Regions:
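Cyclic nucleotide-binding regulatory module and flanking cytosolic helices
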Residues: 1-25, 98, 102
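Short, small/polar residue-rich loop motifs at catalytic or cofactor-binding pockets
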Residues: 13-14, 31-34, 51
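Cyclic-nucleotide recognition modules
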Residues: 14, 56-115
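Conserved short histidine dyad/triad with adjacent acidic residue
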Residues: 17-32, 57-60
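Glycine- and acidic-residue-biased ligand/ion/polar-headgroup-sensing regions
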Residues: 24, 35-51, 60-62
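Polybasic "coupling" helices that flank or enter modular domains
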Residues: 82, 108-154
């Protein structure tokens, strides 16, 4: 259970403006600086980075754009609507600075990601980090290790 459940976050942001997207529309573009924080109200989006599909998000209350906002850098992934999608949208810097409920939710989400990366790192080191593993795998493991230690992402 999260400190701020997605359903509670949805109730909290219901006064934010909404934006509707058609299938195929880009919500977040890698390399761009939108300055926006999006909260999925309904629909389904696909996330990819550098042409690699990372997954599909269809959970109402999912947050998009938080990493770019927190790190003050361009988005690192593309997010595209896979179905008709509606998101709440707000200025990321303002919300993260002034709204403790949203900031706490983002912190929990990021902590969960670091936890998953840590588990993945341990599993990679157990299975593929020893003798006989390719140099590329070893480099990827080290990059992931640095990301976990620094609290960031690879």
């Amino acid at each position: 259970m999260s400190l701020v459940e997605s359903s509670a976050l949805l109730r909290h942001v219901r006064g934010w403006p909404t934006v509707s997207f058609r299938p195929g529309d880009v919500l977040v573009q890698s390399g761009a600086r939108s300055g926006k924080l999006l909260v999925l109200k309904e629909g389904r989006v696909e996330v990819s980075s550098q042409g690699v599909a990372l997954g599909t998000i269809d959970t109402p209350g999912a947050i998009l754009g938080e990493m770019a906002a927190l790190l003050e850098r361009p988005h690192t992934a593309d997010v595209r609507a896979a179905a008709a999608t509606v998101c709440y949208v707000a200025d990321a810097a303002t919300v993260l600075r002034e709204d403790p409920v949203v900031a706490l939710h983002v912190a929990v989400v990021l902590a969960q990601r670091v936890d998953l990366h840590t588990e993945a790192l341990v599993e990679l080191k157990r299975k593929g980090g020893g003798a006989g593993a390719g140099k590329a795998i070893d480099q990827s493991i080290e990059q992931l290790a640095k990301a976990v230690v620094l609290g960031g992402v690879a």
